[in-house]
Structures are given as C-alpha cells and as structure tokens.
Regions:
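Short conserved loop adjoining the S-adenosyl-L-methionine
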Residues: 103-107
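C-terminal alpha-helical "lid/dimerization" subdomain adjacent to the S-adenosyl-L-methionine
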Residues: 147-203
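Conserved class I S-adenosyl-L-methionine
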Residues: 1-43, 46-52
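A conserved beta-strand element that flanks and buttresses the S-adenosyl-L-methionine
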Residues: 114
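A short glycine-rich, Lys/Arg-flanked "PGG" loop and its adjoining helix->strand segment in the class I
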Residues: 128-140
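Class I SAM-dependent methyltransferase SAM/SAH-binding core
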Residues: 55-102
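Core SAM-dependent methyltransferase catalytic element
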Residues: 210-227
Length: 227
C-alpha cells in the first residue's frame, strides 16, 4: 500500500505553512462546486465527503448546505486546523477525519464526494485505485466533483505552457505560489495529462457530465457514478 503521508507534501504537515495556507491559496470560493452538487439533486439531506480537505475551504461552506459533511485529510496538522475552523463556524454536522483516498472508508454509501488539488499527490496507478475506491463509496447516481492541476496539452507544448505559468506566478511566497513552487510541483508531484486522467475516471465507473478548464492546467470535473 502507498504511504499517503509520504505523498502529502511536507508543507502540508508544517504548522507554519498551514497558518498561511488560505492566503497562499487565494481564498477560493466554494459556491461553484456546491452548485455543481445541487444541480445533481444534492440537498440538506445529503452526505458529502471532502478528500484532501485542507483547512476546510470547501467543507465549511458545504456544511451549511448539506446534511452531513466529512472532511478527510492525511495531515494531522491540517485536521487540527480544520477542527478549530469548524468549531468557530458552529458546523456541528462537519466531521473531521484523518485519512486519505486509500485509507478512509465512510461505511454507508454517500451522495457526493469532492476533492480539490489532492489527486495529483498520488501516481497514476494509485489515482486509478483511488477513483475505484471513491466509486465504491458513492451510492448509484452519486456525484464526484474533482478540481486539480491537470495537463491539458500535448507533451511537446510543455515548455511554452510552463513558461506562461511561471510568468504569472506570485513574487511573494506568502501571498501566493511562486515560479519556484510551480517548478517543484512539476518535479515532485504527480499531475497527469487530461488524456490519461479521463479514461481512468470512466474506467472507474463514472460518466463525466461536465468538464471545464482554466487555461491548460486547471481542470474541474463533475462525474456521476453509473447506476
């Protein structure tokens, strides 16, 4: 079995990094992702699991709209920070659990699963295993929402795409991701090509109902488990 802690990225285990995590992430708005679930019928009676939940940028607002949200992260420090944020928000229906794609099991089937910028932490073989496990956690017709850094270009375009990416990076590492951060991601993380990821998703028992890309690097998928 893969050591999920070893693939978490050392920064996600570091308390100082976590304290500035939301600022570095740019405070992403969860509304689009929540709306994607609601468009497929999820509501205040629904159960949702958030894998790689981090500091709860999705999980906390999602707890206001869904019946039960379980936030899962491999980092003990992230889980601790998330529990504090959930308590401050009065989110009594938000459970915070240490675990990952390969280790967590919800017991009863759930209605929706969300993951943002976490699937790239595992190699492609383990992405396939993770997605099959996720399919097993969802009820028939359940919804998977994926956001991740995915390469939507031919290998020969990599130099030009990465040069543009680096040019738009933050100068201050406290305020955002720098060119050095992006270069480290390419070297050490497991982002994959779109033309590899999508067949893995469908082979895992999902129909891709919606997909959108920001530039050639950031993909968002809404997937429905086959009945």
């Amino acid at each position: 079995m893969l050591d999920e802690m070893a693939h978490a990225g050392p920064e996600h285990l570091d308390q100082q990094f976590i304290e500035g995590y939301d600022r570095k992430q740019g405070y992403p708005d969860a509304e689009t992702d929540i709306a994607a679930f609601e468009a497929h019928g999820l509501d205040q009676t629904s159960s949702v699991v958030d894998f790689g939940a981090g500091t709860g940028q999705f999980a906390v607002p999602a707890a206001r709209r869904f019946g039960r949200v379980t936030a899962v992260d491999v980092s003990p420090a992230m889980v601790s920070a998330l529990r504090a944020k959930a308590a401050a928000a009065g989110a009594g229906n938000l459970d915070c659990v240490r675990g990952g794609f390969l280790s967590y099991s919800p017991g009863e089937p759930v209605d929706g699963i969300y993951t943002r910028h976490a699937l790239h932490q595992v190699p492609d073989f383990w992405k396939a295993v993770s997605l099959q496990r996720i399919a097993g956690m969802l009820r028939p017709g359940g919804v998977l929402r994926i956001r991740d850094l995915v390469y939507d270009f031919a290998p020969g375009e990599a130099g030009a795409v990465f040069a543009d990416w680096f040019a738009g990076a933050a100068a201050d590492p406290a305020a955002g991701y720098t060119a050095a951060d992006y270069a480290e991601h390419i070297r050490t993380e497991h982002s994959t090509f779109r033309w590899l990821l999508e067949p893995i998703i469908t082979a895992s028992g999902f129909t891709i109902s919606d997909v959108s890309y920001q530039g050639k690097l950031y993909g968002a998928y809404t997937c429905v488990k086959s009945a």
